Amino acid sequence: MIETNSQPDWRDNGVRVVRADNLDTNTPQTPGMNRAAAINYARVGAQKLWAGTVTIHPNAKTGAHHHGALESVIYVLRGRARMRWGNQLEYVAEAGPGDFIYVPPYVPHQEINASTQEPLEC
């Protein structure tokens, strides 16, 4: 084992706080959705994680897609999320306020607002 006397530069390479009023809305958008990035490689150097906010309009859904090598975590604030996943989107689960959804790398999936009346906020 090689020992070094240098300490990590925790000031510039430690904990990062991304303020709610400093999200990046210059992200790929899907009709019926509003996305804003908080945590990604460009903003904080995250290697395999994307985190941000998503609002899905009533009765809207994404097309089938995956996020490549990135892991995604979704926290439902308001509304009802319906997730479909698999090669044919054959699996389905729902999540509500306070629930977390984990999407592993390369998993084909679709996000759906299960409500025809209320927006889904994640």
Q: Model regions: which residues?
A:
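Residue-level recognition of the GNAT/N-acetyltransferase active site
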Residues: 57, 86, 104, 114
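Short strand-connecting beta-turns/loops that link adjacent beta-strands
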Residues: 43-44, 69, 88, 116-117
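Conserved short histidine dyad/triad with adjacent acidic residue
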Residues: 34-40, 52-68, 105
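A short hydrophobic beta-strand segment most commonly corresponding to one strand
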Residues: 53-54, 73, 102, 117-122
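General detector of folded, globular domains
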Residues: 31, 36-40, 48-51, 90-97, ...
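A short, N-terminal "cap"/entry segment at the start of jelly-roll beta-barrel domains
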Residues: 1-48, 63
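A short beta-strand-loop-beta hairpin characteristic of the jelly-roll/cupin
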Residues: 61, 67-97, 107
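Ligand-binding loop in jelly-roll beta-barrel domains
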Residues: 94-97, 105-122
